[in-house]
Regions:
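Positively charged n-region of N-terminal signal peptides that target proteins for export
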Residues: 1-8, 12-13
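A residue-level marker of the well-folded mature domains of exported/periplasmic proteins
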Residues: 2-4, 22-417
Length: 417
């Protein structure tokens, strides 16, 4: 899905290009074209007025749809507004490739780097510090060990803690009426300690605790991080099963669904592509509706699922938890401010600030999905004006964090509705 940022700059430039392309028009049209082009140039100049030229490199762990959306937004909208040139890597799979990219970025005149390469934050911070380039890592945890580095700014991390809240909200939306259901939770990489999966699984278990007023016989975190399939036994006798793993999900889960024991399927990873067909077949065979909650992203398959009904006449997917992308904007805002002499405002007292980013969005209806995925929505639901408003001497990592925290489904739909 192509996102575009809403800005006077983009509108003016688009109008200019349209009018200028009409060669052979009357002199009045040519005059209008000249005036529009002049106004667009003036607007663009004013939008980046006061910002010294800057170059930022992004070291990407994957080159996927989110990467393409971020690249388009940064190059075409954010960059011109903040006077920033961007440099992008290919997919980086190891620390050696990460180091090489950072060194190439330095040779290309970059002033700063940010990365979302898992496990590479500390090493990248050290290399950037040695080269005199400001650095922000995208991570779900802070990095206090880097706080003595003068060029280490902080962490702009997807809110791992927010996954617990997001999954709780999804479950409340789908089964919050308290009618007894049996639930199968696919905990994904929680057994390996992956924070967002642990939080998503634990948040789901706590939500069920609240919905049914039950008490587990075992610690919630122990259940969430179990490396083997485990029943979350409780005093209400409600069947809740936690199933770990990321490989061969269909092989593992299909027999469980075919047993007819489960009414609700919760995936802490994107399970629709691998289990959508299996769930549909079980629903047809057993004549029952299985509620489907999954982590997902904006895509053609997700859109089709939200706008289609299954064999039981229900929405194919009942709720999705959407990964946030605000950390890209947060990283750029933090680096712009650091480069402009406001690095301390981007750090807390211990020199190791973390901007958690937006809580993952929960979408439960086709109407919500279609509105949020529309082409007129800005990248990460933040306008250019809002980004510019966080790049000045008054901005702090707290104000950047607050902007991200405001990005809930309800607020976004109200803001752009």
């Amino acid at each position: 899905m192509k996102k575009k940022l809403i800005s006077a700059v983009a509108v003016a430039m688009a109008a200019s290009m349209t009018l200028t392309a009409c060669g052979g028009a009357a002199s009045s049209a040519a005059s209008t074209s000249d005036n529009t082009a002049s106004e667009a140039a003036t607007t663009e100049a004013e939008s980046s007025e006061g910002y010294q030229p800057m170059k930022i490199a992004f070291a990407a762990q994957a080159v996927d749809e989110t990467f393409v959306e971020a690249k388009n937004a940064l190059e075409n909208e954010i960059g011109p507004a903040l006077n920033i040139e961007f440099m992008f890597s290919e997919a980086i799979s190891d620390n050696g490739a990460l180091n090489t990219f950072i060194e190439n970025a330095y040779a290309s005149g970059c002033d700063a780097v940010y990365t979302n390469v898992t496990g590479g934050i500390d090493q990248a911070a050290a290399v950037c510090n040695d080269l005199g380039m400001y650095f922000v890592g995208i991570s779900s945890a802070g990095a206090e060990e880097n706080r003595e580095m003068p060029y280490y700014v902080g962490v702009a991390g997807a809110s791992a803690e927010g996954y617990g809240e997001a999954y709780a909200n999804a479950l409340n939306a789908v089964i919050g009426d308290g009618a007894e259901q049996s639930i199968l939770i696919l905990s994904g990489a929680a057994c390996y300690g992956a924070t967002s999966f642990v939080e998503a699984t634990a948040g789901s278990l706590r939500a069920l605790q609240d919905i049914y007023g039950l008490t587990y016989t075992e610690d919630v975190n122990a259940l969430a991080t179990s490396s083997t399939q485990v029943d979350a036994e409780n005093d209400k006798g409600i069947k809740i099963t936690v199933c770990p793993g990321m490989q061969d999900i269909a092989t593992t889960v299909s027999p469980l669904l075919q047993s007819g024991d489960y009414d609700v399927l919760v995936g802490t990873s994107n399970i629709y592509d691998s289990l959508g067909v299996a769930v549909d077949e079980v629903e047809k065979a057993l004549g029952k509706d299985i509620k489907f909650i999954t982590r997902s992203m904006f895509s053609d398959s997700t859109k089709a699922a939200f706008n289609s009904t299954d064999s039981q006449g229900s929405q194919v997917i009942d709720a999705i938890v959407l990964n946030g992308t605000y950390e890209h904007l947060a990283a750029v805002m933090m680096l712009r401010n650091a480069f402009d002499g406001h690095a301390d405002a981007m750090r807390d007292g211990d020199h190791c600030s973390r901007v958690p980013g937006q809580i993952p969005l929960v979408v439960t209806t086709a109407e919500e999905y279609n509105a949020l995925s529309g082409d007129d929505m800005p990248f990460s639901f933040v306008t250019v004006d809002e980004v510019v408003g966080q790049c000045n001497a008054d901005a702090t990592f707290h104000s950047i964090d607050e902007l991200g925290a405001s990005l809930t489904t309800e607020n976004i739909l109200k803001k752009f509705g």
